Every structure is written in C-alpha cells, then in structure tokens.
From Swiss-Prot:
PANTHER family assigned to the protein according to its UniProt record, in alphabetical order: OUTER MEMBRANE PORIN C (PTHR34501:SF1), PROTEIN YDDL-RELATED (PTHR34501)
Subcellular location: Cell outer membrane
Subunit record text: Homotrimer.
Protein's UniProt name: Outer membrane porin C
Species of origin: Rahnella aquatilis
Example GO molecular function: porin activity
A GO BP entry: monoatomic ion transmembrane transport
Family named by the database record: Belongs to the Gram-negative porin family.
Source organism, top-level taxon: Bacteria
Main location: membrane
Amino acid sequence: EIYNKDGNKLDLSGKVDGLHYFSNDDSADGDQSYMRLGFRGETQINNELTGYGEWEYQASLNTAESEDANNFTRVGFAGLKFGQWGSLDYGRNYGVMYDLAAWTDVLPEFGGDTYGADNFMFQRANGVLTYRNKDFFGLVDGLDVAVQYQGKNGSATESTMGRDVLRQNGDGYGMSLTYDLGEGFSAAGAMMASTRTSEQNGRQNPAIIGNGDRAETYTGGLKYXANNIYLAAVFTQTYNARIGVSSDSSHLGYADNAQNFEAVAQYQFDFGLRPSIAYVQSHARNVPGYSNQNLTKYVDVGASYFFNKNMLTYVDYKINLMDDTRLTRDAGINTDDIVAVG
C-alpha cells in the first residue's frame, strides 16, 4: 500500500524472478528471468459504490535491449463494486475457468499447463465483462458466484498484424460457483461456451485441424487448505479446445474433446520450507489424423524456501511423461524434462 486517504487507495505490487531452466530441449533451456509490476487502485464514491482498477505488466530480463517481443500486459481492467450486490468490471482479466485452475496453478514454477492465456476464458483473456458476488448477496456464507461475457477477438488474416489464430475467440459466456464448506474444504464448478471464428475453422489456413462451431468446457474441483496442508484437484472436460503452441507449428488446431486433470499436494513448514508434488495430464480424443493422444503429461516435484514474506528461492523439476510421437513433433509439444531454479 503506497497511498490510503479520504477513500482513495493505491497498492503497488511487483516481482523479480531470476529464473533459469535446465533441459535437453534447446527451446526451453537457458535464462528465463522476468519481472512484473502492477498497480491496484480504489476510490470510494459513496457508502455503497466503489470504483476500482488494476494493471499488471511483465517484462523479460533475458533478451537484448533491442528486443521487447516478450514484454506484455498481463491484466488491465476497471470496474465498480456495489456493496453486497457484487462487482462488475471490464478489460483484460482472468477468465472464470481460472477460478478453479488457480487452485492447482500453485507450483514453484510449472503447473496450469492444461489451461493457457488467450485461450477463450481458460485464463487471462481480452474483452471480458465480469460480474462477481461474494456470499451470494449476503444470503449464503461462503458461496461465491461469477458470470462472464467475452466479446469476439478475431483477425481478418493470420498475418503479424492480426491475432494468432490459436488465440482468437468468438462471442462467449461462462460462469463459476465456489463454495467454502468449512474446516478448510472448498468445492467449485465452472463452465464456458464460445463460438469459434472462421479462421479457427480453417478459412485462411486449411491445415488447421478440428472444425467446430463452439468451444465448450466444464470443470469441477476440490481443495483443502488448513493446518499447513494444501491439497487440490481439478478435472476439466473440453470440446473443441486448442492443441499446439504456435501457428508456426506444422500442425495445429483443436481436439474434438479432451480430459484435463491436475492435482497438487504441498506442506508449509514453520521454518519456511514448502515442498510440493503434482500430477498434470491433458488427454485428447479423436484428434483428426492422430486419434487419441496426450497433449500434456508430467509429474512435478519441487520446493520453495521463504526467507521472509517478500523473498524466496525455489527449485522445480518437471518429469515429462510425454512420448515422442508424430503429434508432439508436428505441434511443437515438448517431451523433455525441465529443471527450473529461481
């Protein structure tokens, strides 16, 4: 907090991560250092109405000064909070599917691989209008509700001047329910449905696989956080969700359906050590030309050590269980282990 006076508040957040990857995969091996800087502000309009906004930026620390392609805005949105009636904001924000994905995206470095930014409403996304209500209008303690709409983000072509086809979306909506069961237990569910753009169905690039009018996702999860123990598991069923990591891949597109599973267990010792173990898998079915294939599969073993609330060090070992197949080669999916130290 850097300012708090007369109903106006401004918070500053930041992070500097000196991060290095060790891997046999040349595309992953090497320096991955970055920094983040963010602001969050609030202004009290009256007893029931509060305005707020948030912005966060990430800058790479592993590129030459003349290169800035990896610098980007993570989130940026503004909104109004209406007391117990909830809040409404618009901008670049987290999709409602991440209300659950965040439960397992807590590993020292990796995790959250079955989701991804700019992939409909799975994670960070553009043009989202989000309504949130805590404790269901004050009627049900622990029941939080979110409803979201995302406007179309498309491109006339797949040129460098337009949006990458894998990161486009049509109009869509989603919602989530999170319930605090007490004693450290929570349960949640979420869904989203978005139309696919014509480019995502191969209008500009006939090589794109997996045509479909809509992308749909349904997810459920459980979490336990008490007594220094953290346990979480999330299962997701997707339809027409993307595969591949880049339009530069020789094969990219969408799986007819896929099942994603993430589970994590952690323990916080009083002296600052937090060991972590996790399992992550995304299995696609009926991928045109490839049949049933894993898109992600690994075990993660890591640990963080907190010197204090502002400083930590960590190591994270991603034990890749993916086989080297035609799909992994065509779609640019990594099959090598990675050790991250930061």
